[in-house]
Each structure stands twice: as C-alpha cells, then as structure tokens.
Amino acid sequence: MCGIFGYLGSKLAIPVVLDGLAKLEYRGYDSAGLASIHLGDLFVRKTIGRVDELRHSLEQENIQSLLAIGHTRWATHGVPTVSNAHPHVDENRTCAVVHNGIIENFKELKSFLLSEGVSFSSDTDSEVIAQLFAYRYQTTADLIHSFSWTLSQLQGSFSCGLIHKDHPDVLLCAAQESPLILGLGEGENFIASDSRAFLKHTQSIQALASGELAIVGLGHEVETYNFALKRISKPVRQVTYTDAGSDKQGYSYYMLKEIYEQPEVLERLVHKYLDPQGHISEKFLQGFPLEDFDEISIVACGSSYHAGFLAKYIIESLVSIPVHVEVASEFRYRRAYIGQKTLAILISQSGETADTLAALKEFRRRQVSCVLGICNVEESALATGVDHCLFLEAGIEIGVASTKAFTAQLLLLILLGLKLTISKHTLSLTEHCACGKGLLELPELCNRLLANENLHSWAHTYCNEDRFIFLGRRLMYPICMEAALKLKEIAYVEANCYPAGEMKHGPIALISKGSPVITFCGDSTVYEKMVGCIMEVKARQAHVIAVASEAQEDIAAVSDFQIYVPNSHSLASPILYTIVGQIMAYTMALKKGNEIDCPRNLAKSVTVE
C-alpha cells in the first residue's frame, strides 16, 4: 500500500528519487519522505501529504549524494504524522529504511529491543526493521549478514530498502510476498515498487521473488541472494512497455484521461482477438485446454470482483457451466468446493493484490490443475505465478478509481465466455460471429457515448444528495455494483446497490420522498421487470434516474432524469453502461470539489491484507 523508490548511480540522487516517488504516488499519499547520505551522515526529510510537499521542503537544500531511498505512504500502522512517515532510522541515526507491507511480529520484536534499551520514535511496525538491523550491526559490523539476519527475524509480507551512513555506495533491498523491482541502467541502478517509476531511465529489470534480497552497488552488477545468503542467478528482462501515458496529456485529471482512453484500449483488444467476421482468434488462450474444465472458480477483490461477477452471468448463460465468484479476502478462510475439473481464475489489475495472491497460494496448496490470471502488469507476482495470464494491455492507469483497466477486464472475460462456446459447442457459427461483431462495434459506440453531454449534466441536479440506491437486474446488476463503488470512491457518498427484484425484501424501506434511485435498464431480457420496479419506487415518491438504451425512450414516462446509451449487442452493453457509471461518479466528485485522482483513504494497489 506504499511506494518505495531507491537510486544509486552517477546522478544527484534526490531529484531522481523525487521523480520516481511522484510516479508511485497512486500507491499512497498520506505522507512522503526520503533519506540520503551527506557529508558522512544520514540526511532524512519527511512531510505529511503529497510528494509535492516533500519536493517543496527540499528546495533550499543542496545534498550532493549519489544514493537515496524514498517512500510514499498509505498508513497501516500509526496515523499519518511526520514521525510515522518513512524513512525510519535507528536511534543512533546510522541506517535508514523504507518499507512496504506489514511486519506481523513487530510487537514481539519491539518488546525485545526495548528490553535491550533501544529507544523508538514512532508507532509504526516499520521502525522495527531499522532498529533491529542496527542492533545486529553493532555486534557484527557486517552489513550484509546483519541485513540477512534482520530479514530472518521478520514475519509477514514486506519489501524494503536500506542504506547505512558508513556505506554510501551500497543500497540493500529485499522482498517477502511484496513487489520490488530492480532497474539496471548504465552506471546506475534503481529499486521501485513498480517498474514504471524508473522506465524513463532503463527498461532492463529484475523482479525480486519472495524471500530474495539484493545488494545494489555503485557501477557494478546487482547481486541477488536468498535470505540465507545463497547466491541466485536471475535473468535480466527487457520490458516492452514505457512510461508513456504517465502524464495527463491535456486532461485535467488522470481519471478523465483514462475514461476517454477506453475506446482505444477496447479497439486494441477486439482487433487482436477477433477477426472482421467476429470469429475469435486462435491467439486468444492459444493451447489452453478449456475443454478440460466443467466449472470455474473466480477470485478477486474490489472492482475486479465485480468484473468476475459479470463473467459469472455471461459464461453461465453462454455455456451453462457453473461459475463461482469469491471475494479474495474471504476465500482463503472458507473451504470452498474445488473439483478436479475446476478452472481457477484470479483477477487483479496490479497483479500484486495481497488477498488475491493468498488465493493463488490456496489454489496451489489444493493442487488445482490450472490457474488463469488476468492483470495489467507483466512482471507482477500474479502474472509470474499462474499457469497462463491474459494481459489487459490497458497501459498505465494512475487514477486510483479504476476505469480503463476495469473495462479491459470485462472485455477479456466476455471473450473467454465466447471462446468457451467453441470448446463446449454451445453456439452455432452464426451466433458466435454475431456476438463477435457486436464486440467489434464497441470502440465506436464508446466514442458516441462519451460525446453525450447529458452524462455530465446529471450532477448539477443531484450534487447535494448524500445517499443513492442503485438497482439492476441480470447483466446490469454487477455493473450497478461497480457504479455504486465508483460513487463511494471519489464522490464520498453512500451508494448502495441491490438486485431490483430484492427491493420488496427490505431495501424499499429506505425509500422516502425525493430519494434518488439510479436504475440501469440495459438488459433487454428483463426490461419490463425493471420498469415494474421503477413504478414501485415511484409510488414511494422516489426520484428516479434511468440509464437505458436509445431504443427504450419510453423510460422517460416513468423516470425523472434519463441517460441514454447507444443500442448495442447484449454482450457489449455492460461495458457501455460501466462507462456511464464512471462519468456519473467523476462529475459528481468534480461538482463536490473532491480530489479525483487520489481520493481519501484509498490506494491504487492493495498489497497488504
């Protein structure tokens, strides 16, 4: 939930680290800080708030150092204060540590160190790493062995970087079930929680696996070991992506830019996997034995869970095999049924979601024959840990509230359903191609939808409301769930979502005069049922915002505000209605004056449980 960046090379380190931290800010923005070595002593600067605050605080400093580590924080232990911000130092200010993750046994370690007379200055678990390392180093005076010993004492998931004032040409780092990427440049090296933070400097990377540490030296190769200091040979990989898209390109916010990038992302995927006749390409899951499976288990968190929930509806309707969708944080604590012919699917935009990776471990423990991943990052733990991975190819997504990555997930899952119809022989060729052609129309339909000014005007009417109810049926229900989540994430309003047919079973008690109810009516098979539900809430004097297709103009007779979506194939409609929900949340948050890209209390990549 935090961002780590480190640099050792031939340039002044602090400007490089500040730029790297700015690219990691989506991972946390409660506080920021960095540490360097200046005139033989540690230099540490920490601030509350965004990386720009840290940058501003350093404007009058002149630190001539080639080594620095930095951190941008999302608080897990200790409130956001300067003392709790990273880097953390030992009591004698000999070493500095940046840390992402949770040290589960920090209380025991802290109690031990306190009994040894060590003084602490923060409430965090992270400070234990610095204090424990310094305690060991006082005895051994051996940098590497002290680091290895310290790591052996820690329990939990973590990645960290460490520098010592007596070793200005060494940067130590380690990973345990938490991402850390090494960037290998010409006469310079980097560490970062996300490789995109250093891609403008180098595209040569190594990803630390769990239980590995690295010794980054000045002007020579990076040495990698396991925690017991057994040397590991790791290949250097050249990444194919760049940091293109990491600026706003004229848009006011990253989220808005990423909403408007969706037609391009969808076009890239449909033309990669569908031919002009709508037939799915052999390149999609080529060689993957879909015919071997008779049920599917999907595990994910947050928006990715909503994508999986839609996949359940679509796959079960297309091929009539059972699909189970699990919240990752709950999956590992229950004995969910997994058969011998179960296909496990894990969805995570970052590929580093802690609970989803824990589910991967559980699938492996239970010897599931095949695990498919869906994510956006090639070097992520999910991508490298599954048997096969479908990549979103959405480009970097910086806005914390997911937009283009989510719709890319939806499209890939819909394509998976379409591919299954071939192996399960449930659609004729004509029916199959009709579905594919409907998906090929998506980029153009998205562009038409985004040109609809009525999408933006709704917030003028409803910006003072602080509670909304979303209603949907069948394919629209998971999309309503996602729309409600978006409204919570960035507009900070209470937004509850229910299957429309459940209103009479309790939620209708929440309706009073003027209550805003948002209905997604885009599933034609249950349209009349949705109209009936609208009439029920209207009878209780609710104010109904109806989102419906252009062919459903009659919805105006029973609703107070209408947003019309271009007519589309039923498989394409969930993606179009998703974009409506994104714009509704964006315009509401904008009207309220909220922070769009970095909403309060949230982080983009949830790397702790």
UniProtKB/Swiss-Prot annotation:
Pfam family for this entry, one: SIS
InterPro entries: GATase_2_dom (IPR017932), GFAT (IPR005855), GFAT_N (IPR047084), GlmS/AgaS_SIS (IPR035466), GlmS/FrlB_SIS (IPR035490), Ntn_hydrolases_N (IPR029055), SIS_dom (IPR001347), SIS_dom_sf (IPR046348)
Highest taxon in the source lineage: Bacteria
Keywords: Aminotransferase, Cytoplasm, Glutamine amidotransferase, Repeat, Transferase
Domain Glutamine amidotransferase type-2: 2-219
UniProt-listed GO biological process terms: carbohydrate metabolic process; fructose 6-phosphate metabolic process; protein N-linked glycosylation; UDP-N-acetylglucosamine metabolic process
Main location, first listed in the record: cytoplasm
GO terms for cellular component: cytosol
Record domain SIS: where: 280-426, 458-599
Listed EC numbers: 2.6.1.16
Active site: 2, 604
Primary enzyme class: transferase
Subcellular location: Cytoplasm
Keyword Cytoplasm: yes
Catalytic activity: D-fructose 6-phosphate + L-glutamine = D-glucosamine 6-phosphate + L-glutamate
UniProt xrefs under PROSITE patterns: GATASE_TYPE_2 (PS51278), SIS (PS51464)
Sample GO molecular function, one term: glutamine-fructose-6-phosphate transaminase (isomerizing) activity
Biological role: Catalyzes the first step in hexosamine metabolism, converting fructose-6P into glucosamine-6P using glutamine as a nitrogen source.
HAMAP family (alphabetical): GlmS (MF_00164)
Record text on subunit structure and interactions: Homodimer.
Protein's name in the database: Glutamine--fructose-6-phosphate aminotransferase [isomerizing]
Source organism per UniProt: Chlamydia abortus (strain DSM 27085 / S26/3)
